[in-house]
């Protein structure tokens, strides 16, 4: 669940930490778990093939040993599936995206590339009888491995191959993955920022034709791949392109595709913490809270549909117009006050007011689920807005229970 990019949290580093600890205690179980990160037969894997280099890098950071047995297992597993892909290529069958994520020889993971290459073509190393021949054998391993990866990448029509070869006009927009689209959409549209304005990046016809292909695709398709993107990434992109209608349309369609993996969640209230502490870590906590809050408001039932409660030192209800796009919802929430406090107790009083004003009976109110999207740096509470005294010796939960109990008795 922690690593699952479709139905779980999609956490990377936390998953690597958990798996590493598990692997040390139960090696066979660790092997099985990692394989499910990268491949599951007839089903979407929990992670992606990029986990190969990421997990190996994590093991090195913990052990300072690039020859650790966990890394050796991952290398063997990777080349096993690479061989299977090559066999499928010769039969013109579908292959995985593994070759796209193999570390490159000139990248920061070049040590892993070399390890993979020598593992795949170890027969060349066994025949070397002196240091010069061994050096030549290693180079032969690297060369053959590069060719193998290149052959597979051409077969799966990887956009990066066409980008590197300057064959931009032949990139097929519908073949571009969600992550590649997010990272390279400016390049695909042949644009760059010049101060506050967007200008043409290159005058080459090759790039202009690519831009026209993507514009046509964006305008004619109802959705753009976005299922594997994190909600915070989409919120971040929405804020980044707040003055760019063309990019907003792309982000809105990716959000629509991303939302298809979620279902209706019943009587659920989204409570979004907009206090200053949420802006740590490049605002990732805040962007996650906004994105998840919007998603919950879209999937909840009638009473709280299109509504979000933000809370810092002063909670506030935000009601979305039913015709608002995802980007417009992000900009609307941007107007929420970004205070330095988190008054959770007052937020709970706001929810109680809605329940009382709508004459919702206690038995129905008890079925509500409140999802709190916060780093939980919450203020202490002594008095409420009704002037009622709350014991400072009680926990906040006790005070909230007393508040709702009193309202239930008066209903």
Where are the model-predicted features located?
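Long lumenal/extracellular ectodomains of secretory and single-pass membrane proteins
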Residues: 1-288, 298-411
């Amino acid at each position: 669940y922690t690593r699952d990019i479709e139905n779980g949290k999609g956490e990377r580093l936390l998953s690597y930490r958990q798996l590493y600890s598990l692997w040390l205690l139960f090696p066979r179980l660790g092997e099985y778990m990692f394989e499910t990160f990268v491949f599951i037969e007839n089903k979407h894997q929990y992670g992606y093939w990029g986990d190969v280099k990421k997990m190996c890098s994590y093991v090195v950071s913990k052990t300072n040993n690039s020859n650790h047995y966990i890394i050796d297992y991952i290398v063997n597993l990777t080349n096993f599936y690479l061989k299977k892909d090559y066999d499928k290529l010769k039969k013109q069958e579908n292959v995985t995206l593994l070759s796209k994520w193999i570390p490159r020889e000139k990248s920061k993971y070049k040590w892993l590339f070399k390890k993979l290459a020598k593992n795949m073509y170890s027969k060349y190393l066994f025949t070397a009888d002196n240091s010069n021949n061994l050096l030549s054998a290693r180079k032969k391993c690297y060369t053959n491995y590069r060719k193998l990866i290149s052959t597979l990448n051409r077969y799966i029509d990887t956009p990066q191959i066409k980008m590197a070869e300057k064959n931009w006009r032949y990139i097929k927009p519908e073949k571009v993955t969600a992550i590649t689209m997010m990272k390279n959409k400016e390049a695909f549209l042949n644009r760059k920022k010049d101060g506050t304005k967007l200008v043409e990046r290159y005058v080459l016809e090759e790039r202009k034709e690519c831009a026209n292909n993507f514009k046509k695709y964006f305008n004619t398709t109802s959705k753009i791949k976005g299922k594997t993107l994190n909600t915070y990434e989409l919120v971040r992109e929405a804020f980044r392109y707040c003055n760019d209608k063309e990019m907003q349309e792309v982000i809105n369609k990716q959000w629509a595709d991303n939302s298809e993996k979620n279902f209706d969640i019943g009587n659920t209230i989204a409570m979004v913490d907009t206090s200053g502490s949420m802006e740590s870590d490049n605002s990732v906590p805040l962007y996650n809270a906004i994105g998840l809050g919007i998603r919950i408001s879209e999937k909840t039932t009638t009473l709280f549909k299109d509504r979000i409660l933000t809370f810092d030192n002063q909670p506030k209800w935000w009601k979305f117009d039913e015709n608002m796009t995802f980007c417009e919802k992000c900009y609307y929430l941007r107007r929420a006050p970004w205070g330095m406090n988190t008054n959770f107790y007052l937020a709970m009083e706001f929810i109680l007011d809605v329940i009382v004003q709508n004459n919702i009976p206690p038995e129905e109110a008890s079925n509500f689920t409140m999802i709190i999207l916060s780093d939980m740096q919450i203020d202490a509470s002594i008095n409420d807005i009704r002037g009622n005294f709350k014991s400072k010796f009680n926990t906040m939960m006790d005070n909230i229970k007393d508040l709702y109990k009193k309202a239930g008795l008066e209903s």
